[in-house]
Amino acid sequence: MIVTETIIRFENVTKQFDNDPPVLDNVSFEIEKGKFYTLLGPSGCGKTTILRLIAGFLEASEGQIYLGDKVINQIPANKRPVNTVFQDYALFPHLNVYENVAFGLRIKKLKKDAIDEKVKEALRFVNLKGYEKREISEMSGGQRQRVAIARAIVNEPEVILLDEPLSALDLKLRTEMQYELRDLQKRLGITFIFVTHDQEEALAMSDEIFVLNKGEIQQSGTPIDIYDEPINKFVADFIGESNIVNGKMIQDFEVEFVERRFECVDQGFRPNEVVEVVIRPEDLEITSAEKGQLQVTVDWMLFRGVHYEVGCIDTDGNEWLVHTTRKVRVGDKIGLAFEPEAIHVMRLGETEEEFDKRLDSYDEVQ
């Protein structure tokens, strides 16, 4: 049996500025020790506010924030065992790499030998051994980020907060740094809390994802859970690309949409309950019109390198997005085929607690 330890807990936390609507609205969640968490959502959803509340840069309007079993609402930022890597890295341009990393240790008045040992160890961890005397102005974007991370880990915090640290990097370097950050977190065993609006980053790096919108957590879970079983239309649309249509749950394992009935793997709905149906573009297979479960017309096509992105319209006017390696032409009449497992049925207005309970019932039946 795996024993988990909660390191951070929010209980009914609200953050409001003046008389504006709450930036965070009655948010509760737990962060387990030693995992990589991502706070994911669009601009203004509240993800950076959560980070700043944990760091101590903001104070909650309501609710309690715990570190372990201790309430930290009133503990100042410099007294919390937390370090932050900012979007712009916040390095000191007049200090070299060594002095940037050593800065926090000097504030703590550690002995010179201890500082030297810790700084060199931190730089080894981020693959910057031998860069101690390098000026910050001489470093690339990826190297500067490594310096910022070394400065964070040298203080041996219990939690490292990362506020969109990859956003300024080009695509190739960003992908490399995703791997490096994930590998570093595993080697250190420290809890990482990463903020991003990039869905691919979140899916690639995280043990757990919290999807936020309008100051509320819409869904939390593993990347696979959230991608395969989105709780609502916002999550389905925000995480990857989705085809979403209105439907009706006829009975367990049978759903109706586009005026046809299909076998599915969902259950626990009321007979004839109005629902929303999601099918991912990569789960649709292009066939001949006669063999397809849906008959559509190709409306447009884009080449994306590893696949074609094909936009189609069915006879009812619904738009369908398909990812395929098969080349078609605009105006072609084609069929779309899919397996029952590709259909995901979403209950309107379902809470995360209700959603989790329904998914648990699937496991019990299986």
From Swiss-Prot:
Q: Where does ATP bind?
A: G41, P42, S43, G44, C45, G46, K47, T48
Which SMART domains does the record associate with it?
A: AAA
* Domain ABC transporter, residue spans: 8-239
Cleaved signal peptide residues:
none
Coiled-coil region(s) at which residues? none
Kindly state which reaction or reactions the protein catalyses. ATP + H2O + polyamine-[polyamine-binding protein]Side 1 = ADP + phosphate + polyamineSide 2 + [polyamine-binding protein]Side 1
What's the protein name? Spermidine/putrescine import ATP-binding protein PotA
Q: What GO annotations for molecular function exist for this entry?
A: ABC-type putrescine transporter activity; ATP binding; ATP hydrolysis activity
Q: Give the protein's biological function.
A: Part of the ABC transporter complex PotABCD involved in spermidine/putrescine import. Responsible for energy coupling to the transport system.
Organism field: Listeria monocytogenes serotype 4b (strain F2365)
Top EC class, one word: translocase
Q: Which gene encodes it?
A: potA
| One Pfam match | TOBE_2
Keyword list (alphabetical) reads: ATP-binding, Cell membrane, Membrane, Nucleotide-binding, Translocase, Transport
Matching Gene3D superfamilies: 2.40.50.100, Nucleic acid-binding proteins, P-loop containing nucleotide triphosphate hydrolases
How does the protein associate with the membrane? Answer: Peripheral membrane protein
